[in-house]
Amino acid sequence: MKNNSFDFLLAFLSEHKNIFVHTDITKAVNFKFEKGFFLKKHLDFLSKNLQDSNLFFPSFNYDFLKNQVYNIENDIIQVGILNEFIRVNYSKFRSSTPVFNFISLDEPSDYKDQNTSLINPFDRTSIFHYLYESNSAYFHYGSDFSTTTLIHYVESMRTNLIYRYIKCFNGKIKSRNAKSSVSLLYHVKPMNFYQKYDWSKIESDIDRQGLLFKFESGRTELKAFNVKNVVDFWLKSLSIAPLYFLDDKSRINVLNKINIENTQLNMSDFE
């Protein structure tokens, strides 16, 4: 049986070259609140205990989908106050992908941020593929398992994804010295159509496989896994059951929508 102690989790994480860290300080390590120092305590904890790994933090901002502009330097992070604190005060790098970008304390040494005018945030040029190809861990530092964006990378690797469709969002990327026109292309779920992931099953399945490492005490919930091991397990599960990620009601909805002539959902069916 896996050891679910705090030290065992940190030891597991420290084995990895890269760690992608989702954060929610309401369920992270329980530090005493001190105004002006609280967020720094969390960053210091991560930096000290994972000092031999490269730490990446999601810096997602969804405004590009509405206003067609991604400003690399100025767009705030919409997925965690700790992440935004790091961006404003300590980050030295932010990736150029609209919506699904990330920050790091130092510029990555071997990840190449080379977006073209046509961007798929989950393809083989993405940070998620880099994590898959390198020795990387995915760490939920208090964040809910349902924030595992890696699931969309797995879906993008499937050639027969039948419950989402590809949509293109045109816009511009702005930085201090440049502006470029781009098209963001990725799979989206249908509007006004019930479709939800079965996160409880997804999490419990990788736990039963011995792939999930966690520490839970009081309100603290820390969870981690090796990216490649979990991606490979999910790909195998999808090859057996293409609707594996979905809950029961969603699977029924999708199966009722498609037919012999229409073997997957299309944008024209909903927009």
Could you say what each language-model-derived stretch is?
Residues 1-271:
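N-terminal and secondary-structure boundary signal
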